[in-house]
Curated annotation (Swiss-Prot):
NCBIfam families linked: DPOR_bchL (TIGR01281)
Originating species: Chlorella vulgaris (Green alga)
Gene giving rise to this polypeptide: chlL
Cofactor(s) the record lists: [4Fe-4S] cluster
Pathway in which the depicted protein is active: Porphyrin-containing compound metabolism; chlorophyll biosynthesis (light-independent)
Entry's family note: Belongs to the NifH/BchL/ChlL family.
Annotated residues for binding of ATP: G10, I11, G12, K13, S14, T15, K39, N180, R181
One record GO biological process: photosynthesis, dark reaction
Name of the molecule in the record: Light-independent protochlorophyllide reductase iron-sulfur ATP-binding protein
Length: 300
């Protein structure tokens, strides 16, 4: 099984990915996590340090693939989860998608790409070009990490569009959304009501998850010395169980930008008993013609 994890930048994809990887390993699977971000910090909480990237290793070998060994690029982290960082081109130059392709090519050369039960691609923020959608070419399922906010759901909708496009030529499905760092899910529910897709799990805002990232550990590793954290691990184990059940997945149909803006803006600008106190911006009048004009201006 190959998974690609996407979501708005800063939404907690890497932390979520690492904990899902451990959860899958706890279920007896051999797991490889591939970080697909030039920051090369995806696997930090698995290994405890920033591992060398594949691109750095290839450059050091003058791109002679035959001189690269598995131990040069694959590092085993906590829970026996193997880790790879694709790395990326210098800022403002090159293509991140090309780097992902080179990573997969090298792993195949090393006969490592097919040795795992699960390969998880942790991809940088929003899909802004076809290059960063490259991991979808290899994935069976896409997971989208979001929160209960406007920006994250807008980014999720763009990723949904990429999944739909890639599904035309690849056996790719959207496994569903993972809500992260949110005690509410009203906006998420509003979105999936109009754009049907599964919601796999919703994790509340838990300080210990943030602390785990700072410490360079997964929640599972921290729970070894603090059993009070076991309930957090259960969230990720639930996600793993659903994925291992081979979900049918969906080929979603994204909303048009204007439709999504209208849907979410109307929700934010209308106070109801359901969203009273749940959104940061609550105005006592619904979306008016003036508001619609402002929306038109935003979307120009």
């Amino acid at each position: 099984m190959k998974l690609a994890v996407y979501g708005k930048g800063g939404i907690g994809k890497s932390t979520t990915s690492c904990n899902i990887s451990i959860a899958l390993a706890r279920r007896g699977k051999k797991v490889l996590q591939i970080g697909c971000d030039p920051k090369h910090d995806s696997t930090f909480t698995l290994t405890g340090f920033l591992i060398p990237t594949i691109i750095d290793t290839l450059q050091a070998k003058d791109y002679h693939y035959e001189d690269v060994w598995p131990e040069d690029v694959i590092y085993q982290g906590y829970g026996e989860v193997d880790s790879v960082e694709a790395g990326g081109p210098p800022a403002g130059a090159g293509c991140g998608g090309y780097v992902v392709g080179e990573t997969v090519k090298l792993l195949k050369e090393l006969n490592a790409f097919y040795e795992y039960d699960v390969i998880l691609f942790d991809v940088l923020g929003d899909v802004v070009c076809g290059g960063f959608a490259a991991p979808l070419n290899y994935a069976d399922y896409c997971l989208i990490v979001t929160d209960n906010g406007f920006d994250a759901l807008f980014a999720a909708n763009r990723i949904v569009a990429s999944v739909r496009e890639k599904s035309k030529t690849h056996p790719l499905r959207l496994a569903g959304l993972i809500g992260n760092r949110t005690s509410k899910r009203d906006l998420i529910d509003k979105y999936v009501e109009v754009c049907p897709m599964p919601v796999i799990e919703v994790l509340p805002l838990i300080e210990d998850i943030r602390v785990s990232r700072v410490k360079g550990k997964t929640v599972f590793e921290m729970a070894e010395t603090d059993q009070k954290l076991n309930y957090i691990c259960d969230f990720y184990l639930n996600i793993a169980d659903q994925l291992l059940a081979s979900p049918e997945g969906v080929i979603p149909l994204e909303l048009e930008d204007r439709e999504l803006f209208t849907l979410l803006s109307t929700f934010y600008l209308t106070v109801t008993p359901q969203n009273q106190g749940e959104t940061q911006s609550t105005i006592s009048t619904p979306l008016t013609s003036n508001s619609a004009s402002e929306l038109d201006f935003i979307l120009v």
